[in-house]
Amino acid sequence: IKNHQSKQIVVFGVGDYTNSREDVHYVKCVSEDELLEKFLKFWETHKPDVITGWNSKFYDLPYLIHRIKYRFGEDAVKRLSVWKTVYKDSVYIQGKEHICYNVFGLEQLDYLDLYRKFTYSSQESYRLDHIAFVELGERKDPNPYDTFREWYTKDFQSFIDYNIQDVEIVDRLEDKMKLIDLILTMAYNAKCNYGDVFSQVRM
């Protein structure tokens, strides 16, 4: 998790991680249950209004919700919402169903969606690695193993570094492109919710 204003990063993990950065706070946990509980307490304390990520709408948030639900049950998922209301939804893209969630009181501005809608350019790939190279001239660290699970279990240090890099790339994209700033301004001028900016009809 990275705060765009303060630039501080908080990382939750189950394993030993050597942290040498002042802008990174590593929260070591002994189990997945402890990690999820500490994450939920962090979330409830800071109460984010807007979150972003690269394909976070269809991957990061659904994965997180599925793990919380599996470990703690449906009621624990409601802790992500200031209104204690979370709805499951589905969207069909090119004939394939994608699961997403509506967390009341939280606006999800997926940076992949923002980039596709507001850059008015067509890319050969919308993988974060490619967009980072096009826009920032940098590449993501490659996975040195066959699977992410293997990477996680065999080299936890570089695996965490990789995840931090993911967050920082999205943050640097926003520093350069100001797409979230654009959304906030458009929503303010149109007197609509942030997510409604994606729909011309609602605006």
Regions found by a protein language model. Name each.
Residues 1-50:
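Conserved RNase H-like, two-metal-ion catalytic cores of nucleic-acid enzymes
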Residues 2-6, 45, 70-79, 180:
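Secondary-structure transition/capping motifs at alpha-helix termini
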Residues 21-26, 61, 70, 75-167:
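Active-site-proximal helix-loop-helix substrate-binding element of RNase H-like nuclease domains
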Residues 38, 63, 131, 169-173:
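Amphipathic alpha-helical segments that form well-ordered structural scaffolds
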Residues 48-56, 186:
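Short glycine-rich phosphate-binding loop at a beta-alpha junction
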Residues 56, 61-67:
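A short acidic (Asp/Glu
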Residues 65-75, 187, 203:
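Short secondary-structure boundary/capping segments
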Residues 149-203:
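Common nucleic-acid-contacting/processivity interface regions adjacent to the catalytic cores
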